[in-house]
A protein has these predicted regions:
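Canonical tetratricopeptide repeat
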Residues: 18, 25, 59, 94, ...
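Structural signature of tandem alpha-helical TPR/SEL1-like repeats
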Residues: 30-42, 68-80, 102-114, 125
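Conserved structural position within tetratricopeptide repeats
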Residues: 45-48, 79-84, 117
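Register position in tetratricopeptide repeats
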Residues: 25, 32, 66-67, 101, ...
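Residue-level recognition of tetratricopeptide repeat
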Residues: 21, 28, 62-63, 97, ...
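Alpha-helical segment of the N-proximal tetratricopeptide repeat
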Residues: 11-45
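Helix-start (N-cap) detector for alpha-helical repeat units in TPR-like alpha-solenoids
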Residues: 13, 54-55, 89-90, 123
C-alpha cells in the first residue's frame, strides 16, 4: 500500500473505510442493498481522500461485484487494488472468482494461480484449487469440442 497521502488524509480515509464496512455489515444483516450503496459511497470518500488506498478499492469492488451484481465495476476495482498492491493475494482471488462466473475463464485461471503463488490461507487456497480444477475441466471439454468440429 502506497503511503503518498498526508497522514491526516490516511486517518480520515480509514475512518470512511470503517464507516463503509459498518454499512455493509447492516446490508448483510438485513439483506438490504441500500446499505451496500451507502457503504460504496463511504468507500468512494475514502478513495477520494487517499487515491492509493488499495483496501478501499478492494472492498468497494467486493461489494459491487458480489452484493450489487455489478461485476464489471467489481473487476475494475480489483484491477486498481492489484495495481496498487501487486503482492496482496486477496484481490487476485476475488477478481478470479468474478471472472470465473461472469467473464473470462482463462483470465480467472491466471488470477487464481497468482493467488495460490502469493497466499498462505489454507481455507481459501483450497477453494482456489477447486475452482482451478473446475476451470481446467471446462476448458478441456471446450477444446475437445472444438477439435471434433
Amino acid at each position: 500500500m502506497t503511503e503518498s497521502a498526508a497522514p491526516w488524509r490516511r486517518v480520515l480515509a480509514y475512518w470512511w473505510y470503517a464507516w463503509g464496512l459498518s454499512w455493509c455489515y447492516w446490508g448483510i444483516r438485513w439483506a438490504n442493498q441500500s446499505y451496500f450503496r451507502s457503504g460504496i459511497r463511504s468507500f468512494d470518500r475514502a478513495i477520494r481522500l487517499w487515491p492509493q488506498f488499495s483496501r478501499g478499492f478492494y472492498r468497494r469492488g467486493l461489494i459491487r461485484g458480489r452484493e450489487l451484481n455489478d461485476h464489471a465495476a467489481g473487476i475494475a476495482d480489483m484491477d486498481r487494488a492489484i495495481a496498487l498492491a501487486p503482492e496482496w493475494p486477496d484481490p487476485y482471488l476475488q477478481r478470479g472468482l468474478f471472472q470465473r462466473f461472469h467473464g473470462d475463464q482463462r483470465a480467472a485461471l491466471a488470477d487464481l494461480r497468482r493467488y495460490l503463488a502469493l497466499a498462505h490461507d489454507p481455507t481459501w487456497r483450497a477453494e482456489a484449487e477447486r475452482q482451478i480444477a473446475m476451470i481446467q475441466a471446462e476448458l478441456g471439454e471446450e477444446e475437445v469440442g472444438t477439435l471434433e468440429r
